[in-house]
Amino acid sequence: MSGRGKQGGKARAKAKTRSSRAGLQFPVGRVHRLLRKGNYSERVGAGAPVYLAAVLEYLTAEILELAGNAARDNKKTRIIPRHLQLAIRNDEELNKLLGRVTIAQGGVLPNIQAVLLPKKTESHHKAKGK
């Protein structure tokens, strides 16, 4: 009865999230849970949530980078919905992907038809030449 029953066993390793194993910020475990609960299929493989989380993280980073550039162009330090709208609509691929998406408080792209712009008068220069 020395009481040394548990001393020889190995200590349990520190838990490591699947996100950190994959080198991601997005939660792989939550994506896996949502895939299972969403009735997309009967079974969900181990790699599917990792891949989906990586894709979502990449798209988010891409949009945030472009929106940050738009905010900096407008001399602002905080990204607002207007900056998201400008970032998405000025990027051809993101605009195609999110073409049917409405961003609240996003506004519209500035666009003036060429016909409506004031005409450059060349007759004024010709009149001086006479």
UniProtKB/Swiss-Prot annotation:
Main location: nucleus
Phosphothreonine modified-residue sites: 121
A GO molecular function held by the record: structural constituent of chromatin
Citrulline: modified positions: 4
A GO cellular component annotation in the UniProt record: nucleosome
Sites bearing N6-(beta-hydroxybutyryl)lysine, chain numbering: 10, 14, 37, 96, 119
Name of this protein: Histone H2A type 1-B/E
Species per Swiss-Prot/TrEMBL record: Homo sapiens (Human)
Underlying gene: H2AC4
